[in-house]
Each structure stands twice: as C-alpha cells, then as structure tokens.
Amino acid sequence: PHDLSIMTYNIQMLGIGEKDAPAKIVDYINNSGNDIVCMQEFPQREASFKKFPAYPYYHRHRDVAFISRYPIVNKGVINFDKGHSAACVYGDITIGKDTIRVYSIHLESYRLGKNEQQIYKELTSGNTQNATQGVKTISSRLVTANRNRAKQAQIIKNHMQQSPYPVIICGDFNDTPISFAYHTLSEGMKDCFIEKGRGLGNTYIGEFPSFRIDHILHTPTLGT
C-alpha cells in the first residue's frame, strides 16, 4: 500500500472579492504536498484547473471538484433533487497497483444571509425586541436544511456501499459530528480527525459559532 495525503478545502470561489485571496489559496494548495485535494465552492470554469499544474487529473460538477496527482480511471456525479444546493462528485484513482474511490461532497447549507447574521448578532447581544420573526425564519431554515442533508447523506451512503474499492469521502458536510448526516456517512468508516487530530478542530469561520463541519472519512482498511 502507498502513503497518500489528501486535503479538503472550501475555497469560497477562490476567495472572490478579496484582493490577494485567490493567489494565496492557489499557492497554498500547490505547495501543500497533498496527492489529492477536494474542493467545494470551486469556480465553475474549466480554466481554473490550470492554476494547479501539479495536479493534471481532475473532476468537477457544479461547485464541487477534486484534483489529483494520480490518474482518474472512472468518474461520476451523484444527483440530488432539484432545488437542493448540494453537490457530489466521485472518482476512482489508481495509485500504483491500487485503486481507491474518492468522493468530494458539499451538503446543503443553511442559506443564512446577512439578515440572519444581523438577527443572530442582536440575539447574542441581548437585543431580542426586533428578533422574534427572525428567529422563526432561522428556525425554519435550520429544520429544512437538516432534513435535506439527511436525505443527501443517505443517497451518498447508498452509493458508497456499492463501491468496488476502498473509499475516502471528504468535503463540507455543513454539519457537525453529532448530526444525522455525519452519523450516516461515518458509519463503518474512520474519521481522520478523530484518528490523528487534536483539540476541537473547528473548520467554520464566520458570524455564527464555529464548529467542525468539514470532514475526511475513510474505509478502515486504508489506515490513517
């Protein structure tokens, strides 16, 4: 078996809107030394892959992609119901005499915008006078997104169970390790952070509380 390094990264359209962010993100990935990089919120332009010359093999659907130093011998897309913002791609990658299947996923987000962020700020600062209706809106979106992610996770899990090769699944789950979606996808798998990580491992940075919502899971036979 070969050593393999893999990374998952929500690149937020290469940091669009921030002057130096695109170049910094590209340099970070190119210099990371990883064999495979799974990305979410990837620009939907074929030319974007040319920014990663060390990774000649790639696959993308919507805003989800992965790039690889090793050949992709088979690749596909998992489709979800119309109207869902989730996306998932997979590919079978040959490394020497071995083949693995890699999934790059981006499960549905809560779709909380600036208005919801402002409501959250008011709530956390103790200003609840104008936030009642906003709380109802946020609660509704949380419930809907959780239900949708649960369905999406089950569809992906069903596909994973048919894989003829060991599996690595990684990406932006938009959900924590105590969620139904994570539980569904991690059943029978190993979590790289649990195996090798330290601390809380928070991966979300934003207006809302930080959690570990990005994950890398793998078939136990692959080791960590």
Annotated model-derived regions:
Residues I6-M7, C38, I169:
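Residue-level marker for buried hydrophobic side chains located in beta-strands
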Residues A21, I25, R45, A145, ...:
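Stable alpha-helical elements in mature extracytoplasmic
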Residues K151, I155-V167, F173-T224:
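Metal-dependent phosphoester-hydrolase catalytic domains
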Residues H2-M7, A23-K24:
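Alpha-helical transmembrane signal-anchor/signal-peptide segments
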Residues P1, G17-A21, N30, I36-Y120, ...:
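Structured beta-strand-rich core segments of catalytic domains in phosphoester-bond hydrolases
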Residues I11, F42, L107, D172-F173:
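Active-site metal-binding loops of divalent metal-dependent hydrolases
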Residues Q117-S140:
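A solvent-exposed, charged loop/short amphipathic helix patch at secondary-structure junctions
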Residues M7-L14:
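Amphipathic alpha-helical repeat scaffolds
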